């Protein structure tokens, strides 16, 4: 049986100790993401607490940190400065909307170019149509100098993940879960 999960108040967690323990158990590069509710994440604390998690992650020397492009400009600039030379930055946005068209996706990504080393965009997808828009955008960018990760959540969202090598995607997220339900959620597993 797995250990029982017992929720604790946020302020009772020593972030430095927790991050060191987390990193110590993983030999591969660590990507720290602390996604807010507004972008489909599960961090339920305040924005100030979330930024504190990102700061602590950078201070701990994680390999990568995921910084949403909608973080307040002054705060994002401070985090980018802290990360410089020790932690690489993924600039991300997670839209609750479906992708409008491939050209707009490409323009959005090009507009984010200076925001991080890898540009990650994620859209809600509902099938073939939206999956093809993401695929087309990734195809159009595959030979550019931009490092990208383009994906969807929902049916059709897994196409760019599955074809990551063909599309020259620089980062593909997968799960350790298995099951036929993953495809309808736009996810792939690691095996």
Which residues make up each language-model segment?
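Active-site beta->alpha loop and helix N-cap motifs at the rims of alpha/beta catalytic domains
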Residues: 2-84, 88-101
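Catalytic alpha/beta core domains of metabolic enzymes, predominantly
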Residues: 70-191
């Amino acid at each position: 049986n797995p250990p029982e999960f017992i929720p604790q108040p946020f302020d009772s967690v020593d972030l430095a100790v927790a991050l060191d323990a987390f990193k110590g158990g993983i030999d591969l590069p660590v990507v720290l993401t602390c996604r807010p509710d507004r972008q489909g994440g599960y961090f339920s604390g305040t924005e100030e607490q979330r930024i504190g998690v990102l700061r602590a992650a950078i201070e701990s020397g994680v390999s990568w940190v995921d910084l949403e492009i909608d973080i307040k400009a002054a705060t994002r600039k401070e985090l980018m400065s802290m990360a410089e030379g020790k932690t690489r930055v993924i600039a991300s946005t997670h839209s609750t909307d479906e992708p409008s068209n491939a050209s707009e996706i490409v323009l959005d990504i090009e507009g984010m170019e200076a925001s991080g080393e890898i540009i990650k965009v994620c859209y809600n997808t509902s099938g073939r149509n939206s999956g093809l828009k993401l695929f087309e955008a990734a195809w159009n960018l595959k030979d550019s100098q931009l490092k990208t990760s383009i994906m969807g959540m929902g049916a059709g969202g897994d196409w760019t993940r599955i074809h990551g090598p063909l599309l020259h995607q620089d980062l593909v997220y997968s799960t350790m879960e298995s099951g036929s339900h993953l495809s309808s959620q736009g996810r792939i597993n690691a095996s």
